[in-house]
């Protein structure tokens, strides 16, 4: 992070907090609501009902997350400007934060599903697998962030394509987009591992 522009970590944190709202409202709500039924099904050794409860909650998380992803991608600059656009928060900061939000929401569905599957593990009394996969994915995020920062700093054509895609071509400090990109990829990989081990 020391190689990034001043204020990059703040922008990353703002974007992370914005994308955490739908994860908290949708993913956490459905996973917490499903937990008692998962515990009941597992204690009665009714695996068909257990998988059914996971399936119902997963469909609801996906159903509600997809429109929110669309809204966040399309209206990201407006949302960031309304919520954060006061005081010293410049238009360039708004654009970088909005681009970060767009990268974060790539993994919005998988973040919600991870919360659900972790509750499924907890319902069975298995806390080791989700702990190890979450630690592994956290390490992966750190490694990917360092790798992407290096790549973006040494390959201007790659960062240029990302800047064009996210419409931040003329904004300085776009290397910080390596952080939300690494987080999104790490979240997707975390979901894949938790799903495979489930």
Spell out what each predicted region is.
Residues 1-198:
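Membrane-embedded alpha-helical bundles of multi-pass transporters/translocases
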């Amino acid at each position: 992070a020391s190689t990034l522009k001043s204020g990059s970590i703040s922008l990353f944190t703002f974007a992370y907090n914005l994308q955490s709202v739908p994860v908290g409202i949708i993913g956490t709500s459905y996973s917490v609501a499903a937990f008692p039924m998962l515990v009941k099904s597992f204690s009665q050794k009714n695996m068909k009902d257990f998988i059914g409860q996971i399936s119902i909650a997963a469909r609801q998380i996906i159903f509600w997350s997809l429109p929110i992803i669309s809204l966040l991608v399309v209206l990201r600059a407006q949302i960031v400007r309304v919520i954060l656009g006061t005081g010293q928060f410049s238009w360039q900061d708004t654009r970088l934060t909005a681009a970060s939000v767009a990268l974060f929401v790539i993994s919005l569905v998988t973040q919600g599903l991870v919360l659900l599957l972790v509750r499924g593990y907890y319902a069975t009394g298995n806390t080791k697998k989700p702990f190890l996969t979450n630690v592994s994915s956290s390490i992966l995020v750190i490694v990917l962030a360092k790798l992407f920062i290096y790549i973006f700093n040494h390959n201007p054509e790659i960062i240029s394509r990302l800047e064009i895609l996210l419409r931040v071509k003329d904004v300085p400090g776009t290397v910080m987009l390596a952080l939300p990109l690494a987080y999104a990829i790490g979240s997707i990989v975390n979901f894949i591992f938790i799903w495979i081990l489930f």
